[in-house]
Amino acid sequence: MPDLAHVIREISEEMAQRSDRGAVADYIPELARVDPDQFGMAVIDAEGQVFTGGDSETPFSIQSVSKVFTLTLALGMVGDRLWKRVGREPSGNPFNSIVQLERERGVPRNPFINAGAIAVTDVILSGHEPREALGEILRFMQFLAQDSGIIIDETVAASEKRTGFRNTALANYMKSFGVIDNPVDYTLGVYFHHCAIAMNCRQLARAGRFLAHNGVNPSTGHSVVSAERARRINAIMLTCGHYDGSGEFAYRVGLPGKSGVGGSILAIAPGKASIAVWSPGLDAAGNSHLGRIALERLTQRMGWSVFGA
């Protein structure tokens, strides 16, 4: 088995030398200001050892990576009844597509596209005030990462709200079909805020560990979800975690993963490691360009693909 610390150091150096970095998300003004010349990586192995490279301690907006954790929470609240409100199939369309939602009568294709994540957020909000629902999401993230210092970047949340016209359209369209129960403004407020949670690579990798270990957070021994549910969340991450780039990610990386337009990717090597990478420059599908390349090299060198070494 190759030395993991050496592999991560090697990959970080390779990423620092690349000139093709993608383009930062410019439709959220606060994200457009992020320096694209950054790359960070953290891997936590089965024994709990942490290996890092590059800008692994720099906080970033996790954006759609939060959808893994809101899905986990919603499933804990309502179980498989959630799947009456959202599907489990890849979309093959941009993450904020309105056309697909219209064709499918307001039921989002999966919980990781924007419409699906808004519907999942609405489930968490039901029976709560928005502040309470958001607090529950944030505390869950802090608990998983074992770090009470994780915060919501209010500036990013406000920036998303000011420019979130497409998400508002998606939410209103779902509301017209009865998929959204709560006031649209309340649901979107919680959604924009949980996407604006700020974490670094080390924190994000720690938060994802339960998905690498049959639903158990090995740091605490706490069972977050059942082994079956962990496998199913990983399956949705593999098939739907990178929007219309999910097939390419599965082909090249071969791990369950979830990306965010802030440039981060959480990837899971079941039984082996939880991995977080971050580089703000995105590819055409809205996924971290260097993040995907780094993960491809990591799985190749460590033999971690779920499809075989």
Swiss-Prot record:
Segment forming the signal sequence: none
InterPro entries assigned to the protein according to its UniProt record, in alphabetical order: Beta-lactam/transpept-like, Glutaminase
Disulfide bond residue pairs: none
Pfam families (UniProt xref): Glutaminase (PF04960)
E.C. code: 3.5.1.2
Top-tier EC class: hydrolase
GO BP: glutamate biosynthetic process; glutamine catabolic process
Keyword Hydrolase: yes
Binding site for substrate: 64, 114, 160, 167, 191, 243, 261
A GO term for molecular function: glutaminase activity
Swiss-Prot/TrEMBL keywords: Hydrolase
Catalysis performed (reactions): L-glutamine + H2O = L-glutamate + NH4(+)
Family stated for the protein in its record: Belongs to the glutaminase family.
Subunit structure: Homotetramer.
Classification via PANTHER family: GLUTAMINASE
Name of the protein in question: Glutaminase
Originating species: Methylobacterium radiotolerans (strain ATCC 27329 / DSM 1819 / JCM 2831 / NBRC 15690 / NCIMB 10815 / 0-1)
